[in-house]
Amino acid sequence: MAVGKNKRLSKGKKGIKKRTVDPFTRKDEYSVKAPSTFANRDVGKTLVNRTSGLKNANDSLKGRIFEVSLADLQGDEDHAFRKVKLRVDEIQGKNCLTNFHGLDFTTDKLRSLVRKWQSLIEANVTVKTTDDYLLRLFAIAFTKRRPNQIKKTTYARSSQIRAIRKKMTEIMQREASSCSLAQLTSKLIPEVIGREIEKATQGIYPLQHVHIRKVKLLKSPKFDLGALLNLHGESTTDDKGQKVEREFKEQVLESV
């Protein structure tokens, strides 16, 4: 008989299953909060493994990026074609405080804008806000018919496209460089920059569907907790009572 391991002895009993542990028992739920520039601050919930040993739950949450529909943040279905990226910068209790990280259009909206018989004009610019956020803004615009136009096509000449693109970059540079990231977000929601471009280029060629279709965050400044808390409507300073000065009056006892 050959010397070796007896295979029949090493086999375990049939029917005994390995005990499975539910992974969700080791997880905690955190609320994701959007900055106060948006109407609805409750983004949703996120799960993370509970703090154990050297692994801290807060470190796992910081840096997470959430893509949310602007319609949910504003409570208005007219903004459904725009997506906002929010990045977790700080954890306060069970709340994840986020900051603006970017903006984009849905693919179906972009595809629906592109049509025949018109010119598509695109421009992008890299700009720094007053609070040192480096952003790249992408704009898109389409030509439209002039009043009382009989011709079917609305193609702009190359010289007109160059002039329109120059105006687009100038307006984006001016609007973004003169404000903070929070103020720029407030401009992007009602599409203030798009309307400015449409108004400024009216003399060159009439435009329609002028949008800032994408905002990309290239570089962030050094993290400032106070600025983030102010963005979320909170404060780091403690309310302290004022010192009240009173004149000392010696108490006179009438009876002993």
Swiss-Prot record:
One GO CC term, this protein: cytosol
Cell location: Cytoplasm
Name of one Pfam family that matches: Ribosomal_S3Ae
MF annotations from Gene Ontology: structural constituent of ribosome
Keyword rRNA processing: no
Region called Disordered, residue ranges: 1-20
Highest taxon above the source species: Eukaryota
UniProt modified residues of type N-acetylalanine: 2
Subunit structure: Component of the small ribosomal subunit. Mature ribosomes consist of a small (40S) and a large (60S) subunit. The 40S subunit contains about 33 different proteins and 1 molecule of RNA (18S). The 60S subunit contains about 49 different proteins and 3 molecules of RNA (25S, 5.8S and 5S).
HAMAP family for this protein: Ribosomal_eS1_euk (MF_03122)
Family, per entry: Belongs to the eukaryotic ribosomal protein eS1 family.
Protein name: Small ribosomal subunit protein eS1
Lineage: Eukaryota, Fungi, Dikarya, Ascomycota, Pezizomycotina
